[in-house]
């Protein structure tokens, strides 16, 4: 049986089957676990311990001993370290969510491009096959004219060469199709032998946004830039944590203990409460080194954000310009196909009537094949560049409505 697959179905299948998507989703769970840890470090913690012993002192008999203790501790002041760690962990959760969303976008783009690659290769096989058929028919006509004595042997040989070359293009085109199909199957994690029937095809959807609109939209919505800004905030928190090394820490501790019985009573108990203050007065420059390192990391994060903005700006502009170029190409090549078809028909009829030459047929056929291939390439180039532009912008919606 043959699996029918629309473009939306292909994207959904990739989202379900691609382990890269699962990995980013698991990253969200890891970030949430880290947040729970950070919050726990700023809360009360309980510990309990119990020891049981048995000893014989100078053969006076065995004595049993039992010591029990319960204690609780609570950080009162950490110079803001615990609070900063909680904020940083909350940012980790947001970053993990954005990474998952970006993985969805890049996976969707890869599937869309692979889907259109298959369709393009399939369409071009039709062009190559039509060229082979035309050269095959032309060879038959030349052989008949040669048998009648109206054409030279050299024209038969030239026709055979052109037919052979056309078959080479057909073979290469089929190989491109099979390779593109394998790439699509790989993205969808399908069996490499399962036949596929792609049910969607290119549909021209105008894109009305200007290049400036697209760049602005990308700089506001691109997930990587949002991630960079969150990581920049984390580096700022890390600087505060490093400077907290100059400050004291205060902890509250409570405890209870007893021995020789399971539970304490009025005659057998020990209660304690304490507030501990710790202040690292001199550490031979360790804290200063941590502050310098944190400030350097902050500068790196700032530079990374600026670099990514520049890279995204360039990528958006390239894909936008390439999309517009492809749009102009397929609008112009549609007329070229009709002209090439008419030119080929005229050249063929003139040749049959003995008024044309072999070169006219070859040139007309090559022009027709090229025009058809250019039209196909332009269509799917437009679709691929439009998808790439939308992915570059960080979403599937263009910044301006389509003018009807």
Where are these regions (language model features)?
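Amphipathic alpha-helical coiled-coil segments
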Residues: 23-38, 103, 107-130, 137, ...
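Bacterial Sec-pathway N-terminal export signals of envelope proteins
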Residues: 1-47, 76, 192-233, 281, ...
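Outer-membrane beta-barrel architecture
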Residues: 36, 71-73, 238-241, 276-278
């Amino acid at each position: 049986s043959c699996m029918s697959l629309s473009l939306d179905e292909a994207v959904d299948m990739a989202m379900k089957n691609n382990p890269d998507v699962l990995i980013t989703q698991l990253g969200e769970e890891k970030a949430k676990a880290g947040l729970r840890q950070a919050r726990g470090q700023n809360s009360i913690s309980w510990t309990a311990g119990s020891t049981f012993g048995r000893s014989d002192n100078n053969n006076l008999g065995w004595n049993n001993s039992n010591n029990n203790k319960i204690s609780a501790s609570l950080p009162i002041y950490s110079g803001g370290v615990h609070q900063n760690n909680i904020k940083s962990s909350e940012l980790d959760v947001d970053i993990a969510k954005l990474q998952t969303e970006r993985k969805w976008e890049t996976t969707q783009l890869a599937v869309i491009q692979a889907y259109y690659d298959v369709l393009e290769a399939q369409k071009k096989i039709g062009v190559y096959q039509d060229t082979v058929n035309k050269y095959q028919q032309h060879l038959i006509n030349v052989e008949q004219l040669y048998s009648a004595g109206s054409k030279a042997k050299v024209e038969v040989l030239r026709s055979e060469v052109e037919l052979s070359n056309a078959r080479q293009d057909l073979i290469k085109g089929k190989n491109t199709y099979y390779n593109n199909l394998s790439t699509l199957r790989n993205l969808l994690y399908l069996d490499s032998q399962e036949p596929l029937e792609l049910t969607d095809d290119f549909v021209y959807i105008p894109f009305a946004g200007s290049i400036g609109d697209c760049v602005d939209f990308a700089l506001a919505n691109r997930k990587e830039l949002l991630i960079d800004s969150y990581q920049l905030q984390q580096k700022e928190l890390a600087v505060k944590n490093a400077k907290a090394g100059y400050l004291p820490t205060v902890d509250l501790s409570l405890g209870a203990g007893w021995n020789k019985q399971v539970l304490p009573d009025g005659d057998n108990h020990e209660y304690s409460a304490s507030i501990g203050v710790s202040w690292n007065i001199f550490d031979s420059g360790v804290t200063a080194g941590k502050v310098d390192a944190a400030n350097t990391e902050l500068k790196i994060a700032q530079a990374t954000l600026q670099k990514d903005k520049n890279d995204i700006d360039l990528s958006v502009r390239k894909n936008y310009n390439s999309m517009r170029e492809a749009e102009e190409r397929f609008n112009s090549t549609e007329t070229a196909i009709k002209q090439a078809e008419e030119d080929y028909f005229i050249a063929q009829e003139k040749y049959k009537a003995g008024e044309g030459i072999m070169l006219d047929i070859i040139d007309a056929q090559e022009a027709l094949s090229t025009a058809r291939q250019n039209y196909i390439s332009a269509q799917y180039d437009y679709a691929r560049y439009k998808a790439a532009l939308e992915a570059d912008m960080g979403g599937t919606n263009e910044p301006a409505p389509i003018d009807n």
